[in-house]
């Protein structure tokens, strides 16, 4: 199916219960054409629209038509002060067409049979947003490992409990007199976006304020979170240095990761090796620039070196080759930002007498600081990009903000469980240990997810931000390469999930102009054939979309 509008213009169309295409709306969309960062466009620089991404990292009941069931109760409204605009009530869309379940049932039955044949488990639920009733189910109450679909819960609870306008803050504190600071303290409350470039900007601003000497230490105040930097279940893969397994801390830097850059020079000469940010990694070994080679073979081995990192590099890079970039997690973030800030200040000519250490909780005077973007924008890294680091940081932030500092994963899990229980969204077997869904940590049923999706849809405080953070089939995020035939409809808004033997997909399917809509959840456990599972999942969702988009109801469907 060809899109109704060019893809770049499609990216500008609103994602929520849109009005009909009036002349004013068309003019607005055309004006958006020239904006590379427009909402929904695939701009790699914007967290609101992730580029093409790989599947999430490391990452038998018969189908039945369910009789009428009571709608999910509306969630309690969050504080109006947390919203960017005054909240309004959210009306339910029109009820899904009566032929939806009968038309989808054969696809579901075939999928269920395939899962059973391959010794897997299935949890499936389909809920009508118009009536609030569960239309179809297959093991809907069975709690399975949800993989990154857990981020649907973390995003909803964060938006509800913290508010869409919530911002993180990072600052440098101390007392500066006559160019001398007795000490400097970096303090944060969990901002996952804080970068080396921003820290360097802080250092430059300190110099502009007149800083010439730090008589004591550069301290890092990590007190907003507890000292368990490794999220629950991450210990199941202890030797993994990939950045998706980064530790979580109140003060983080560059997502608590480092990047090796290898630049080719002349054949036979040593390649130039640099780590970013500088000053945290001690390096041994070398990489050679090679003549006549077609591919690089750069090796990087990391190991803890006290609170810092040691690195051993080896291998070669072809002459004239592109720069090699390897990003890896750090082990202990306790003083990471302090070590790097001290290094930057020294390069700027500031004398730092002391060392980088943890502490400074009693410092009250902020010299410089900055707020993050709003949570409504930041949370898109969970839905569209499936970012584990952002998810685990938000998870602990929930604990710190709602149960007091230091925030812990255990308290965060309880915040999420209490939130679900208060809204009667959970099923038996519900278990939450971490906020990202990585590893074998959580158990959630498809019915819980569809109830959650309905509750978020109807919540006037979080509804817009929650739907916006989901990937759109055929257009962006982890669904950019899936549902490509539906990109013109923009009908599938969902979250993917992948682990070794887990494949998940949960979200919304909307009819034309979102006049109808359903929440769905498909969880498959025990089968590692991800590609085939996704094809079968997508076929099921496509059938739902086609039914909602059929222009003349059952007569049109019967003629297909």
Question: Which role fits each region the language model picked out?
Answer:
Residues 22-31:
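Bacterial N-terminal signal peptides
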Residues 139-144, 327, 436-439:
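A short glycine/serine-rich beta->alpha loop
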Residues 137-157:
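Short active-site loop at a secondary-structure junction
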Residues 114-138, 357:
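A short, well-structured edge-of-sheet supersecondary motif
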Residues 135-137, 395-560:
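Small-residue-rich helix-loop
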Residues 132, 151-158, 218, 251, ...:
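Residue-level preference for non-acidic, small/hydrophobic
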Residues 1-16:
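N-terminal secretory signal peptides that target proteins for export/translocation
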Residues 35-39, 43-54, 59-115, 160-427, ...:
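Conserved serine DD-peptidase/penicillin-binding transpeptidase domain
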């Amino acid at each position: 199916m060809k899109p109704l509008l060019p893809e770049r213009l499609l990216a500008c169309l609103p994602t929520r219960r849109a009005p009909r295409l009036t002349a004013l709306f068309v003019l607005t969309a055309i004006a958006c054409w020239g904006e590379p960062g427009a909402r929904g466009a695939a701009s790699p620089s914007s967290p609101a629209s992730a580029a093409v991404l790989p599947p999430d990292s490391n990452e038998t009941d018969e189908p039945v038509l369910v009789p009428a069931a009571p709608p999910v109760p509306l969630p309690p409204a969050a504080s109006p002060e947390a919203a960017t605009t005054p909240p309004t009530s959210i009306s339910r869309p029109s009820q899904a067409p009566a032929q939806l379940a009968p038309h989808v049932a054969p696809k579901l039955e075939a999928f269920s049979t395939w899962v059973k044949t391959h010794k897997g488990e299935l949890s499936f639920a389909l809920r009508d947003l118009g009536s609030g009733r569960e239309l179809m189910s297959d093991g809907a109450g069975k709690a399975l490992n949800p993989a990154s679909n857990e981020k649907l819960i973390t995003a909803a609870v964060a938006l509800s409990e913290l508010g869409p306008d919530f911002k993180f803050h990072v600052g440098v504190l101390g007392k500066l007199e006559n160019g001398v600071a007795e000490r400097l303290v970096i303090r944060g409350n969990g901002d996952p976006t804080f970068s080396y470039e921003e820290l360097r900007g802080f250092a430059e601003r300190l110099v502009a304020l007149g800083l010439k000497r730090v008589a004591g230490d550069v301290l890092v105040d990590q007190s907003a979170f507890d000292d368990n930097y490794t999220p629950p279940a991450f210990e199941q893969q202890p030797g993994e240095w990939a950045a998706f397994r980064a530790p979580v801390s109140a003060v983080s830097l560059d997502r608590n990761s480092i990047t090796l850059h290898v630049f080719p020079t002349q054949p036979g000469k040593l390649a130039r090796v640099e780590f970013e940010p500088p000053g945290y990694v001690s390096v041994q070994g070398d990489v050679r620039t090679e003549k006549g080679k077609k591919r690089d073979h750069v090796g990087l081995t990391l190991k803890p070196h006290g609170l810092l990192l040691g690195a051993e590099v080896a291998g070669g890079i072809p002459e004239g080759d592109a720069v090699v970039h390897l990003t890896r997690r750090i082990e202990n973030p306790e003083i990471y930002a302090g070590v790097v800030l001290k290094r930057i200040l020294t390069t700027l000519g500031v004398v730092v007498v002391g060392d980088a250490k943890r502490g400074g909780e009693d410092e009250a005077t902020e010299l410089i600081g900055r707020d993050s973007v709003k949570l409504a924008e930041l949370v898109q890294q969970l839905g569209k990009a499936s970012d584990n680091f952002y998810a685990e940081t938000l998870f602990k932030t929930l604990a710190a903000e709602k149960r007091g500092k230091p925030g812990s994963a255990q308290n965060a899990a309880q915040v999420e469980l209490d939130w679900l229980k208060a809204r009667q969204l959970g099923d038996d077997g519900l278990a939450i240990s971490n906020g990202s869904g990585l590893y074998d940590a959580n158990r959630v049923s498809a019915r819980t997810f569809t109830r959650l999706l309905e509750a978020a849809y109807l919540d006037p405080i979080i509804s817009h931000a929650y739907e916006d953070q989901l990937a759109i089939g055929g257009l962006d995020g982890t669904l950019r390469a899936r549902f490509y035939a539906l990109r013109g409809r923009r009908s599938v808004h969902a979250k993917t999930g992948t682990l070794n033997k887990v494949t998940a997909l949960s979200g919304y399917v909307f009819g034309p102009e979102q006049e109808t809509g359903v929440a769905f959840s498909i969880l498959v456990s025990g089968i590692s054939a991800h590609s085939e599972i996704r094809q079968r999942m997508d076929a099921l969702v496509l059938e739902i979309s086609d039914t909602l988009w059929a222009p003349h109801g059952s007569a049109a469907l019967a003629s297909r």
